[in-house]
Amino acid sequence: MIETLDSPANDSDFLDYITALENCTDEQISFKMQYLPVIYSIIFLVGFPGNTVAISIYVFKMRPWKSSTIIMLNLALTDLLYLTSLPFLIHYYASGENWIFGDFMCKFIRFGFHFNLYSSILFLTCFSLFRYIVIIHPMSCFSIQKTRWAVVACAGVWVISLVAVMPMTFLITSTTRTNRSACLDLTSSDDLTTIKWYNLILTATTFCLPLLIVTLCYTTIISTLTHGPRTHSCFKQKARRLTILLLLVFYVCFLPFHILRVIRIESRLLSISCSIESHIHEAYIVSRPLAALNTFGNLLLYVVVSNNFQQAFCSAVRCKAIGDLEQAKKDSCSNNP
């Protein structure tokens, strides 16, 4: 029978229970050592140079800047900031969860992961709303496409993400376990009741609401284009690719992480068997790099969003043949009704 630990209980029993759970999850250290450093290394080796190139193209090659350009540039910046934290996590998990960089860096790296995660989610939501207005309400798009609106939206995203994630600097803790210094993530820190309610509010406001908005935006866009005059145009094909890519990022990368984070925190508050707790923690570990894989999806997004980006990339790497092919495709699309 499952018994909640939220109600007042004997303090020594509670501490004994938490210690037992820590012993359960300690069994995952070898799994983390084999899984997380490898996946994080792949993400870093692909994502860091990819986002560096993307930022360079947006800054030096893309002219004139449009609303989508500004949003994509900010998205690439937040991805790059996140990727710079990965070497610290790679070292941490490869060394058997032995944190050598101090308490400040522990909080900073954990804060950086969540700050850039939610910045990325909100930038993708802003981009989806801009696309929705341009396609569904074209008469309003002339004002909304002015770059000042994108600048305001991006500034708002940075501020909202900062405010939303700031409490983590107080909730995330580092500790010493079995002769090693551990940098705990949100789900493993100590103030469980506060963490539970903070996590629920954070998930509802900065993930569930954006997920609903993005889903409604793209289902409406596809429905409108399907029954509209441009049914067979390249415009619709591009919209379909964007829809599939954005929804994959949200439902494959972000959704499992948020669901399993809620379950992981709840499992620490409920009196459950060590075996179940171990399996929940293992599933949560698997979901964490999934959330980071959105950086791969974002790299594809830069290419899909703009033909100008494709041409600028080809110009940067001197791939003239591919550039000619993309120009031919663009001309073909523009000639379609």
Swiss-Prot record:
One of its GO terms (cellular component) is plasma membrane. Disulfide bonds join C106-C183. Residues 59-69, 138-151, 222-242, 306-337 are cytoplasmic. G protein-coupled receptor for dicarboxylates and amino dicarboxylates. Receptor for itaconate, a metabolite produced by myeloid lineages. In the respiratory epithelium, couples the binding of itaconate to the activation of GNA11 and downstream intracellular Ca(2+) release, leading to mucocilliary clearance of airborne pathogens. Receptor for leukotriene E4 (LTE4) produced by mast cells upon allergic inflammation. Binds with high affinity to LTE4 and elicits mucin release from pulmonary epithelium in response to airborne fungi allergens. Regulates mucin-producing goblet cell homeostasis. InterPro entries: GPCR_Rhodpsn, GPCR_Rhodpsn_7TM. Its main location: membrane. The chain crosses the membrane at residues 38-58, 70-90, 117-137, 152-172, 201-221, 243-263, 285-305. One of its GO terms (molecular function) is G protein-coupled receptor activity. Belongs to the G-protein coupled receptor 1 family. Residues 1-37, 91-116, 173-200, 264-284 are extracellular. Highly expressed in mast cells and is found predominantly in the tissues of the respiratory tract and kidneys. Glycans are attached at N23. The keyword Glycoprotein applies. It is found in: Cell membrane. This is 2-oxoglutarate receptor 1. GO terms for biological process: G protein-coupled receptor signaling pathway; phospholipase C-activating G protein-coupled receptor signaling pathway. It is a multi-pass membrane protein. Keywords: Cell membrane, Disulfide bond, G-protein coupled receptor, Glycoprotein, Immunity, Innate immunity, Membrane, Receptor, Transducer, Transmembrane, Transmembrane helix. It comes from the Eukaryota.
